[in-house]
Amino acid sequence: MAIYLTELDSKSLDFPPAENALADPNGLLAFGGDLTPERLIAAYHHGIFPWYGPGEPILWWSPSTRAVFDPNTFLPAKSLKKFQRKAQYQVSINHATPEVIKLCGNTRPAEETWLNEEMQAAYISLALQGVCHSVEVWQDQRLIGGFYGLSIGELFCGESMFSLETNASKIALWYFCRHFSEHGGKLIDCQVMNSHLHSLGAFTLPREEFLQRLLCLKQQRVTSGCFSPQWLKRHNA
């Protein structure tokens, strides 16, 4: 049976409705276009994100269920609290965004390198526009973990994370959830559920509910200073 898939017009930033995404493969909505900052921003504002492998065209997705965190109710595991009390990790925001993006792509096994140089350059461009942000974890002035994503009002769209030392990415998420919540953040989008996200407390929303929440959250703003370059206070767990 033939499958109809929209090819994006290079001269237009319009996307088909996210509800038109295929059931198999789950969430595939369109192909083509480019990774300009304008198109990426338009995509995320409609609950759509790019993901494609080597040799494939740019593919755009909006899966039927969305993995998310509620930063206001995020609870770290007791073992993570215990680890944090002993670890000499420091956490920052927007101190090394290009480096975080590159490490998210370069520290993955070869078969998982969807975050290619083209994608990395696209998100670095968004960082220069103040749309893409990073959370960094440091040990003895060495960058050992973190993640990056896009801010859309009271929603943060997490893209990718990396960890070079034990629990580094978990510490990054924990600290960011508290910081984001304190500045009025309401939801963190993780796109597709996996065992690691589930173990950290992520849950899923049906696409329709996620899009409804996105519509409301993108019209709001977190409080001033949320994404200013800064060091986050150490938690007294």
Swiss-Prot record:
It is an enzyme of class 2 (transferase). It catalyses: N-terminal L-lysyl-[protein] + L-leucyl-tRNA(Leu) = N-terminal L-leucyl-L-lysyl-[protein] + tRNA(Leu) + H(+); N-terminal L-arginyl-[protein] + L-leucyl-tRNA(Leu) = N-terminal L-leucyl-L-arginyl-[protein] + tRNA(Leu) + H(+); L-phenylalanyl-tRNA(Phe) + an N-terminal L-alpha-aminoacyl-[protein] = an N-terminal L-phenylalanyl-L-alpha-aminoacyl-[protein] + tRNA(Phe). This is Leucyl/phenylalanyl-tRNA--protein transferase. Its EC number is 2.3.2.6. The lineage of its organism: Bacteria, Pseudomonadati, Pseudomonadota, Gammaproteobacteria, Vibrionales. SUPFAM superfamilies: Acyl-CoA N-acyltransferases (Nat) (SSF55729). GO terms for cellular component: cytoplasm. Keywords: Acyltransferase, Cytoplasm, Transferase. It is found in: Cytoplasm. Functions in the N-end rule pathway of protein degradation where it conjugates Leu, Phe and, less efficiently, Met from aminoacyl-tRNAs to the N-termini of proteins containing an N-terminal arginine or lysine. It comes from the Bacteria. One of its GO terms (molecular function) is leucyl-tRNA--protein transferase activity. One of its GO terms (biological process) is protein catabolic process. The keyword Cytoplasm applies. Belongs to the L/F-transferase family. The gene is aat. InterPro entries: Acyl_CoA_acyltransferase, Leu/Phe-tRNA_Trfase, Leu/Phe-tRNA_Trfase_C, Leu/Phe-tRNA_Trfase_N.
